[in-house]
A protein has these predicted regions:
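Intrinsically disordered, low-complexity regulatory segments
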Residues: 1-152, 160, 319-322, 410-411, ...
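Metal- or metallocofactor-binding catalytic centers and their adjacent structured scaffolds
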Residues: 221-253, 260, 417-420, 430
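Feature marking long nucleic-acid-engaging regions of large polymerase/nuclease enzymes
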Residues: 83, 99-113, 171, 186-190, ...
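C-terminal or mid-to-C-terminal helical accessory/interaction module adjacent to the motor/catalytic core
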Residues: 119-206, 243-247
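Basic, low-complexity terminal or inter-domain segments flanking catalytic cores
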Residues: 2, 14, 21, 78-81, ...
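A conserved hydrophobic secondary-structure block that centers on an alpha-helix together
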Residues: 262, 266-273
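NTP-handling and nucleic-acid-processing catalytic cores
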Residues: 1, 5, 11-14, 38, ...
Length: 688
């Protein structure tokens, strides 16, 4: 008699239906143990967060309070049964199996752990025939990640509480989340400072074709003069023709990150939403495991796709996909694919959308590329041949390849009609600002995380969600600035018309943008912990964890390396807390007086201590110099304190709550608001 333990109730129910009465299938409902967490007199004391720092970072695990009934059920279900652990085939799954074995006092044997990549009867039976031992390298890699993240979170968070002036509660800093926050702000900063180049394009419309053709200028002729030449002779002759074969390849099989990105672009799904649907599809036995770095598809299933392609299209359309390697990929698994080429009829509409996406990709990734023959025809005439040429493009379908999956009517096309002459109808030259950079959305965030090696696909959803939950970022639409566009048009009637118009800026939908609170937290982390929030550090930790999983590094050494990189700074920061006034951080000293930065109901201000305590509002100063509160430095404080500034015996410049103003013999004058706050005597006397 056997007890088979998986981590999901839905998965347990599905598997129970495949097995006979000798097997009982129960679920652990995820992790049943976690690091101990208890209150201590001093927050940040290692004794409070379940890690013995002085004993090789030995963890202390306790059963989670909400899982006590689950554990009780597992213990009673294991009586007189041999236990088999069937959690997911990844590091979290391996750790769940190990923790469950420890709690149930089940020995780590060579044959009590099974793995499978799809929930089907054949896959489960095969897994039971080939059991293995719980992989302690994978377990230790997961333990190292958990311990590192607990250490950083519990050690850095008190520094944030004491050094950041905010009404928000529960500030915290995580290793991976902080690295992403840093990258999000870099993009924000790049957009703030972006100055677009002017883009110039010239396009012509011809009688013989139904699309606009670009003009390539090869001289410095003025556009208006060029258009006058066009008006003199509108007939353009073929000067040259270039033929080029082009292949349009199908997309590779889905991995976690590409599924998340494609679902985001195609349906607007959030990462978490995509993964929740994929989890249901997996537990229902419709797709393979959805957390994977590998593009590999098994030979057995590829043979099924080959038959499907041959039966529905042509056997010559089949081509087995290559397994391209992804940066940081663990690649122990298959890609995300459907488990059967017969579609289910019991899915919810939202589930069917994602299922069809995976189904289509499974099939088309096994098909040959679409092939085109591209023709680029240069046309010009004797009046402008030294000034440039138009390019007329034609595309001929030579072989539909994978695209026949979407449109069975596609077939090889004949050679397009390429004229000897083309008659220009109209031409438009446009001058406009170049496109501004895009704020990140969830799809591009996934691409960024993948490119930099921060986190792993299975954690992407959590990383993005954590920043949002902590109010360090927000998801909102962003309207780009309106654009001024200048056009010069040569009409059919030989008129040359010049126009200027304002075009509304594009709306960037659902963008992830850093909040003022996120900026405060990041500014502090950059000032003191840049070494551990930089993407190269976080990526290196991920690489080290991979080496632990492969048995090439000791997990304690990885933890110690990370801990040693920040603990000295943390201790120093905690010692400096006593120098702050309440929650107000100390900027520095000016003439022996401590200067603190605060945020009140009338906006940011600086507190000057000494014989008398004085508060000075800095809201208008920040607007004048285009700075954020987080960027206000002791040098800015010195500048603010330099006012009132004497111009002569009768004239003084003041900095008040509403900006700079002038006093002349006691009379107040409104003056121009200058970021540098510098005003000459000549300027001031001109006002008088």
């Amino acid at each position: 008699m056997y007890l088979l333990i998986t981590e999901s109730p839905a998965k347990a129910k599905k598997i129970q239906g495949f097995l006979n009465e000798n097997y009982k299938v129960l679920s652990s409902c995820g992790h049943i143990r976690d690091l101990e967490k208890k209150k201590t007199k001093v927050y940040g004391d290692p004794k409070g967060f379940g890690i013995d720092v002085d004993n090789d970072f030995k963890p202390k695990y306790v059963i989670m309070s909400e899982k006590r009934d689950v554990v009780k059920n597992l213990k009673s279900g294991s009586i007189d049964r041999e236990i088999i652990f069937a959690a997911d085939d990844d590091r979290e799954g391996e750790a769940i199996a190990w923790h469950t074995a420890n709690v149930l006092k089940s020995p780590i044997k060579k044959d009590n752990r099974i793995i499978f990549r799809e929930i089907s009867k054949a896959a489960i039976i095969e897994a039971l025939k080939t059991p293995r031992q719980i992989d302690m390298n994978e377990v230790n890699s997961q333990q190292a990640r958990r311990i590192i993240d607990r250490l950083i979170g519990f050690k850095l968070s008190p520094c944030l509480w004491k050094n950041i002036n905010t009404k928000e509660k529960g500030l915290s800093a995580g290793r991976v989340q902080s690295a992403l926050l840093n990258l999000v702000e870099k993009r924000d900063d790049h957009i703030r400072k972006f100055v677009p180049d002017e883009v110039y394009t010239t396009e012509g419309s011809f009688e013989e074709i139904d699309k606009k053709c670009p003009f390539t200028k090869i001289s410095d002729i003025d556009t208006e003069d060029l258009f006058e030449n066009f008006a003199q002779d509108r007939v353009f002759k073929k000067a040259s023709i270039e033929e080029k074969k082009v292949k349009d390849y199908p997309e590779k099989p889905f991995i976690t990150s590409t599924l998340q990105q494609t679902a985001s672009r195609s349906f607007g799904f959030a990462i978490k939403h995509t993964m929740n649907i994929a989890q249901k599809l997996y537990e229902g036995g419709h797709i393979t495991y959805m957390r994977t770095d590998s593009m590999y598809i098994s030979d057995d299933f590829s043979k099924k796709v080959k038959k499907f392609v041959g039966d529905n299209f042509n056997s010559s359309d089949y081509c087995k996909p290559g397994a391209k390697k992804v940066k940081g990929a663990q690649e122990a698994h298959e890609a995300i694919r459907v488990t059967s080429l017969t579609k289910p009829d019991d899915l919810e509409p939202i589930e069917m959308k994602l299922y069809n996406l995976i189904y289509d990709r499974t099939v088309t990734s096994h098909m040959k590329p679409c092939e085109y023959l591209m023709y680029k025809v240069r046309v010009t005439n004797k009046d402008i041949q030294d000034d440039g040429y138009f390019t007329v493009s034609h595309k001929r379908l030579m072989y539909p390849g994978y695209k026949i999956y979407y449109d069975k009517s596609l077939k090889e096309e004949g050679k397009p009609d390429i004229n000897e002459t083309y008659t220009l109808e109209e031409c438009i030259a446009t001058q406009k600002p170049g496109n501004m950079p895009q704020y990140y959305d969830e799809s591009s965030i996934v691409s960024l995380l993948e490119k930099t090696g921060i986190g792993r696909p299975s954690t992407y959803s959590t990383i993005v969600g954590t920043l949002d939950n902590r109010k360090y970022t927000e998801k909102r639409d962003y309207k780009e600035p309106d654009k001024e566009i200048k056009t010069l048009t040569l009409t059919k009637d030989d008129e040359i018309i010049e126009e200027e118009k304002m075009v509304k800026g594009n709306i960037q939908k659902k963008r992830i943008i850093i909040t003022p609170l996120g900026l405060k937290v990041l500014d502090y982390l950059r000032s003191h912990f840049m070494n551990i929030i930089h993407e190269t550090f976080t990526s290196q930790v991920e690489n080290d964890l991979d080496l632990v999983a492969n048995g090439e590094l000791n997990y304690v050494d990885v933890i110690r390396k990370v801990y040693d990189s920040f603990i000295t700074i943390v201790d120093g920061q905690m010692k400096n807390i006593s120098r702050n006034v309440g929650d107000m951080p100390l900027l520095g000293k000016i003439k022996g007086n401590d200067i603190f930065l605060g945020d009140g109901k009338f906006g940011p201000y600086m507190k000057i201590t000494g014989k008398k305590v004085k508060n000075m509002n800095i809201s208008n100063y920040l607007k004048l110099v285009n700075k954020r509160t987080e960027d206000f430095t002791i040098k800015d404080a010195e500048k603010v304190m330099s006012y009132p500034k004497k111009i002569n015996n009768n004239i003084y410049i003041f900095l008040g709550p509403h900006g700079f103003y002038m006093k002349y013999n006691g009379t107040i004058f409104t003056i121009e608001q200058r970021p540098d706050g510098e005003y000459s005597e000549e300027y001031c006397m001109g006002l008088v």
